Amino acid sequence: MRILKIQTLRGPNYWSIRRHKLIVMRLDLETLAETPSNEIPGFYEGLVEALPSLEGHYCSPGCHGGFLMRVREGTMMGHIVEHVALELQELAGMHVGFGRTRETATPGIYQVVIEYLNEEAGRYAGRAAVRLCQSIVDRGRYPKAELEQDIQDLKDLWRDASLGPSTEAIVKEAEKRGIPWMQLSARFLIQLGYGVNHKRMQATMTDKTGILGVELACDKEATKRILAASGVPVPRGTVINFLDDLEEAIEYVGGYPIVIKPLDGNHGRGITIDIRSWEEAEAAYEAARQVSRSIIVERYYVGRDHRVLVVDGKVVAVAERVPAHVIGNGRSTVAELIEEINQDPNRGDGHDKVLTKIELDRTSYQLLERAGYTLNSVPPKGTICYLRATANLSTGGTAVDRTDEIHPENVWLAQRVVKIIGLDIAGLDIVTTDISRPLRELDGVIVEVNAAPGFRMHVAPSQGIPRNVAGAVMDMLFPNEQSGRIPILSVTGTNGKTTTTRLLAHIYKQTGKVVGYTTTDGTYIGDYLVESGDNTGPQSAHVILQDPTVEVAVLETARGGILRSGLGFESANVGVVLNVAADHLGIGDIDTIDQLANLKSVVAESVYPDGYAVLNADDRRVAAMAEKTKANIAYFTMNSESELVRKHIQKGGVAAVYENGYLSIVKGDWTHRIERAEQIPLTMGGRAPFMIANALAASLAAFVQNVSIEQIRAGLRTFRASVSQTPGRMNLFNLGNYHALVDYAHNPASYEAVGAFVRNWTSGQRIGVVGGPGDRRDEDFVTLGKLAAEIFDYIIVKEDDDTRGRPRGSASELITKGITQVKPDARYESILDETQAINKGLDMAPANGLVVILPESVSRAIKLIKLRGLVKEEIQQQNSSTTVIDNQNGVASSSVINTLL
């Protein structure tokens, strides 16, 4: 077997709307292409020996052991690889269960789809599954050592990429509230919400966390001085920089016992408490110097260690932290007790689980020695042996919830302290013998104020009630049940995507909002180009959704991006599907128009239930998407007699209809006439039906998002088929005694649309400079040739600079073949170089002629036209002298009439 390609999906996709995290592996079975598993000697036995846990896979039989039943009876290797890849992740602690295997149009080549939690782990699991299955085919077994290494590697990948318990708690709470989130490039840096409404967090610091507060909290001595000056009980202490000053510092704080810690440490690093001798003090000083140049020496206060969490000025959780320890059973040594406690499945390495495994350091041995034990000692039953001086969870400590026990005065004090330091989220370390009594009564002190406090001890205490502290953070960042969302409008289809996206963005600008939009020619925010290029995939969508100024996102969503990575967002408010026609077939294992429709249906299916899928009622494949989506439906149609739309409106639905020369919004008994088509510049005086359809779709998408009819009309009236607003989309130029038209038509449907306009526009000679992308099927080029023969009087066949793997001249020959099949006496020539072909077409243009250029490079075509000298871009203007009245009905366009279609 051979892996041909591995793709990572991260959003709603062709395989699943709900499951976003999928690996798609294109697998060539090679010699196993026609060999089911039951015909491979020893394969079943070898697979069960390697992965007996596959017994738990139900598969199509729908019962325990169902998958292995299929293997025994005979199934193809791609299917087996799918299940093995899922099981390997499961054995590494990643609970995944979704998979699909489909044979492509190429015999022996399969698409294997597996769910993942971590991208790298998912890709690794796919490759490891192929290795495992191939090994069993070749040798009858997969070595145990290799399997163990695979599982360990997967565990390492999973651990290294995990968000951490605090961030994970925040993410889960966001998901529960329907707040979208995304992980940014830096580890633990996440974005909650989109655009102007988004917030960012790193660990438990927010973008509202003040830098001065963080700096102050990190300088523990400065914090202590400020708090002491405010009457807050803090430990007596001082800061030293040299060992020679240590003895004087000990005397200053009142003698032993003392605490020594780094000035700017965290997570308990370099801290030693309950120091009772000079030797211990020297060792503690050196340990602290490993973390900081400046060392704090403090009086040691006897009591229990508490962490009080304050969010947005309120105490939301309190935990008593217990240092890492073991409890004797009268039989086991200290070392054995540590090993036993570390077997707890809730303990892991670092922060990857709710508790951390206990690891020993210098302090551990000192504590054991002080208690009269070694690692080989057997403590009496019930005896507590402390292994760490500090109670941090990161060093193996545990937590007991005390939220309901803290005294109101201590609550008030904690909240006051956090306000003094200036933090929105803070963790206070308080030492007192009883948190239910005021600190002042028990000589309790506030030891530290911590920025970015961990949430583990609160969300998963070893004893007591788990506290939803992430909920308090969400309440602070998104008060009053805010969702953090902005309107997202996604536009897809075979043709018209860019024009509709630009028009929709332009309409939205009439509302005064900042619109971010992506198209095949670039990414834009407001009136400015952010990045040029074909930006119709998820990465470009993220540029818009991460921008803090964007209030509305209008995203052109192309086939390629959905296939490669899925959508760049979880759900949209509006999903527009313009049409589905033959294009890109045979690419990415999308071989039929029905498959292409299923792919584009992802946009309609990924709309919020309270949003709208805006569908073309005149395209049966698009109209059928209404059955797949849970969203509301809004249809647009060029046919005012559409039976589908009539029934939809009778049921209370909304639609955009081209009727009596008007673009109208219809809902129930009411028709809102927006504008006469000939008054909309984009429609070229009403002579471009496909542009009317685009305008209907954009108007309807805006209407269902509560953009007013007046604002929609203003947008339609001021948007033109110009180089500045729609480059490469029906750009018409006046070159004196002839005209040139530039359009990025590159598939049969778009050729037909251009042809309809050309026939309506001129009766003069029509010259076509035609071609198509090299990765299309042979029959597609032949079809382009046939259509060109029907549209143009003279044809110049050219090829793209990038032939996309096709031999130079091949596409031209196929187009020529199509031309001659339709019109044997057609006038044509082949000039493969696009620049030369365009110049030839312009050179030979007769008076009153029209040169139609369908280029690979729109910018190059426009540049060549402008080099001709005095060139006027002819933009269809609104005819202000025309009274906007329907002569047939005598109704002003701005009025609302009672009409039932």
Swiss-Prot record:
In the C-terminal section; belongs to the MurCDEF family. InterPro entries: ATP-grasp, ATP-grasp_RimK-type, Cya_phycin_syn, Cyanophycin_syn_N, Mur-like_cat_sf, Mur_ligase_C, Mur_ligase_C_dom_sf, Mur_ligase_cen. Signal peptide: none annotated. NCBIfam families: cya_phycin_syn, PRK14016.1. GO terms for biological process: biosynthetic process. Keywords: ATP-binding, Ligase, Nucleotide-binding. Homodimer. Catalyzes the ATP-dependent polymerization of arginine and aspartate to multi-L-arginyl-poly-L-aspartic acid (cyanophycin; a water-insoluble reserve polymer). It holds the Pfam family Cyanophycin_syn. GO terms for molecular function: ATP binding; cyanophycin synthetase activity (L-arginine-adding); cyanophycin synthetase activity (L-aspartate-adding); metal ion binding. ATP binds at residues 493-499. This is Cyanophycin synthetase. SUPFAM superfamilies: Glutathione synthetase ATP-binding domain-like (SSF56059), MurD-like peptide ligases, catalytic domain (SSF53623), MurD-like peptide ligases, peptide-binding domain (SSF53244). Its EC number is 6.3.2.29, 6.3.2.30. The gene is cphA. Residues 224-478 form the ATP-grasp domain.
